[in-house]
């Protein structure tokens, strides 16, 4: 085993988000459009070395009992990697657990280092117990990203931490679109240099292995969590039947009345009914009482997490990151508007909102004007899916205040619903990158995908992204990894797409009903433009063919969202199916995973491989073919 050497991290807390860009939805301040090219210049810079040690320890994160979790450098939630745009990163992982692992850098494009993307069986072999691995990549694009395990569902056990890359000083920023005042702009610039990433996630009393074990034993699509964590701290709240009914979606409540006693379970979940699981033989006798029907209630010994802000600056900058296993989360702060200025590490034309949606895998950066009472203002976080009423809290403390505000003005209730119809919500798919960036007006190739449960004879928790085949989790153990194979010998299949370098590629994802749900999709290797969506099927062979048959404005080629994680469209009206179209340029050759970021969906098969640039396939360095990224020791 390679010896452990801990290097001091001399890193400054610098941060500002920039990257390509594109447009403005309603509610944005107008501005002269600036168009830039995809990609960022490389800057000569020193090496930043960052080391983490992984262990398994017990934690009671929500006051409902201890369970095993993954600790990074003896802490629950890993340390933040700070770097500057253009820095070369040496990220060393030491695995002291009794299980295999890997680390993926979510949103980092790995344009010249695909062997550091961290997907076992695809870009590397597993990091075995007692082994170490050196990831080596360049911080091409500024912004907030995060590192997390890509082995099994270890993210659900806490294996994640933030990556913050500061941009060039001359990078254009959108703060003048938030305020025309020079003092405000200077304050926002100062606030952004002190930006803090805040992790918000769902949490289960079960480890990821136990969670999947319940799915397998009961043959259900298990979706009932115990709490919401903010920066690793949370509580379990047990609401009354009346309170749950009041916050349950009316359609869901009516279905429950017709099918199963009329209410959510004591944990606020839709019970594991046949209707919602599909036509499978369920074994509900194998579902533990604590899984759905028993709410213990509890609070972390640390209480609610406190976000301290310095009012002398005038503004605060926060980036909310969702590494959760299942749920997109709605977030609001009492008495404060949220000025969204970056999404997925990418500046956007600012949008002012009362509530923001943080998808699993997404990062939402907000400016907050510190002009309210010096007090502890409540931060509210809640599940956005209809399947469970689940909320959590943190506190935004002005200058270390200990008092509650005299006249609080909440924006959302416990279930994440807006208090007033006049309030504004933000979703990442509403964003437009700043400065402007446009996709090509047509694509060189189109791939149509179909997201659905596999159905019989498969299990209730098995999914497909292609319509008929699932990406088996056993691929994590493929040896040699696909990237190290001769790409000419790898056939193009339903689960393996091939593109040519420089091509513009359309991916059209049809989400099958009934009850078509939104899936947070993440493509490794690059961001994508979300160019259109709609209800119903997509019978056309390409976007170009579809344009004459759909209403004007269905597609946006001028200023579409530019994201590394996007939601497919959920059920609309009476249509069973929905469709979502994204476009990207195959600029960076490599073997990239494209998958749903809901961990039970990915482990259940909702993934596939995209081999971009097969005509310019990279040569993998010998260190990554043989020695986990390290150079072999010199022989004397």
Swiss-Prot record:
Cu cation 3 binds at residues 150, 524, 595. The keyword Signal applies. Cu cation 4 binds at residues 519, 596, 601. The keyword Signal applies. Its EC number is 1.-.-.-. Disruption phenotype: Abolishes the production of cercosporin. Residues 1-23 form the signal peptide. It comes from the Eukaryota. GO terms for molecular function: copper ion binding; oxidoreductase activity. Cu cation 1 binds at residues 104, 522. Glycans are attached at residues 136, 304, 472, 576. Pathway: Mycotoxin biosynthesis. Cu cation 2 binds at residues 106, 148, 597. Residues 62-168, 318-381, 486-613 form the Plastocyanin-like domain. Keywords: Copper, Glycoprotein, Metal-binding, Oxidoreductase, Repeat, Signal. Multicopper oxidase; part of the gene cluster that mediates the biosynthesis of cercosporin, a light-activated, non-host-selective toxin. The perylenequinone chromophore of cercosporin absorbs light energy to attain an electronically-activated triplet state and produces active oxygen species such as the hydroxyl radical, superoxide, hydrogen peroxide or singlet oxygen upon reaction with oxygen molecules. These reactive oxygen species cause damage to various cellular components including lipids, proteins and nucleic acids. Belongs to the multicopper oxidase family. This is Multicopper oxidase CTB12. It comes from Cercospora beticola (Sugarbeet leaf spot fungus).
